[in-house]
């Protein structure tokens, strides 16, 4: 890592409690020269898919770093704690699919280990707070240049847990795609890439509602439904001045059909 290392930090811990601060404290004590970028701590509780999407869509724009992510409904169970290298980054977190989309965005998994070395872990080991006691201590050591192999035994990249592939179904007059995420503004991001939208006309229908094929929000009238390619290169459905998720009554995992109108 760089002489002044970077660590990014993504969780579902929220900001009402001291969980984030405790992890920051561990990082500061063990790696006082590291700079920490808080990606978000407002991932919906236990929503691994949302955490994976946020992380994967953010890491390409961060400096070379150790990326710590904790959305871990299986904490304390037999699920593995892992660290892996991918491109110019390292990722640390639970083996529940959270890290692998980000690893792909960085160029793919080069090597992975299970975090079992007790010398790398916190002196106090809580069964329910591995962010503080496992992932933060490991991230700090990696940020300071400790070898990944010293953290624990190697894991075959193909044996890592992966999230199910979201549905994307091209059709003659459009496509059906799974809702990947809903952001703070109520915009509905689909798993479909922007290429599926290119050949469709300006007049569209989304779940039988009229919409426009747009480049910006203002291409639709106020309150109008629009479909565009978002900043991650994926198809998104939005409302100019409103919340598409509320209008369409959809949540992540639902399916939406986008067709020529």
Swiss-Prot record:
Stated family: Belongs to the SAM hydrolase / SAM-dependent halogenase family.
GO MF annotation terms: hydrolase activity
Span of the signal peptide: none
Keywords linked to the UniProt accession: Hydrolase, S-adenosyl-L-methionine
EC nos: 3.13.2.3
Activity dependence on pH, as recorded: Optimum pH is 8.
InterPro entries cross-referenced by the UniProt entry: SAM_HAT_C, SAM_HAT_N, SAM_OH_AdoTrfase, SAM_OH_AdoTrfase_C_sf, SAM_OH_AdoTrfase_N_sf
Site (Important for activity): 72, 79, 130
Protein name according to UniProt: (R)-S-adenosyl-L-methionine hydrolase
Annotated residues for binding of (R)-S-adenosyl-L-methionine: 187, 231, 239
Reactions that this protein is recorded to catalyse: (R)-S-adenosyl-L-methionine + H2O = adenosine + L-methionine + H(+)
Function: Catalyzes the hydrolysis of S-adenosyl-L-methionine (SAM) into adenosine and L-methionine. Is likely stereoselective, specifically hydrolyzing (R)-S-adenosyl-L-methionine ((R)-SAM), the inactive form of the ubiquitous cofactor SAM, and not the active form of SAM, (S)-S-adenosyl-L-methionine. Probaly plays a role in preventing accumulation of (R)-S-adenosyl-L-methionine in cells; maintenance of (S)-S-denosyl-L-methionine homochirality is important for cellular health given that the (R)-form is largely inactive as a methyl donor and can function as an inhibitor of methyltransferases.
Organism of this sequence: Salinispora arenicola (strain CNS-205)
Regulation of protein activity: Activity is inhibited by chloride.
Annotated binding of adenosine, by residue: 12, 72, 187, 239
């Amino acid at each position: 890592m760089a002489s002044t290392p970077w660590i990014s930090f993504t969780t579902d811990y929220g900001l009402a409690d001291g969980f984030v601060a405790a992890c920051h404290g561990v990082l500061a004590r063990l790696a006082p020269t590291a700079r920490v970028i808080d990606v978000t701590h407002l991932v919906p509780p236990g929503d691994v898919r949302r955490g994976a999407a946020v992380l994967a869509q953010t890491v390409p724009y961060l400096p070379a770093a150790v990326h710590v992510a904790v959305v871990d409904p299986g904490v304390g169970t037999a699920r593995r704690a892992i660290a892996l290298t991918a491109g110019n980054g390292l990722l640390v977190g639970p083996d529940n699919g959270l890290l692998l989309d980000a690893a792909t965005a960085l160029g793919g998994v080069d090597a992975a280990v299970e975090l079992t070395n007790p010398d790398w872990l916190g002196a106090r080991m809580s069964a329910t707070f591995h962010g503080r006691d496992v992932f933060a201590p490991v991230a700090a050591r990696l940020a300071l240049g400790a070898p990944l192999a010293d953290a624990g035994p190697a894991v075959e990249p193909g044996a890592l847990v992966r999230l199910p592939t979201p549905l994307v179904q091209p059709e003659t007059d459009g496509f059906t795609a799974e809702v990947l995420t809903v952001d703070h503004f109520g915009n509905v991001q689909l798993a479909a890439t922007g290429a599926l939208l290119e050949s469709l006309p300006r007049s569209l229908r989304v779940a039988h509602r009229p919409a426009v094929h747009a480049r910006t929000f203002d291409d639709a009238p106020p309150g109008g439904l629009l479909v565009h390619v978002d900043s991650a290169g994926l198809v998104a459905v939005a409302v100019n001045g409103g919340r598409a998720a509320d209008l369409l009554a959809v949540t992540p995992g639902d399916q939406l059909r986008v067709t020529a109108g």
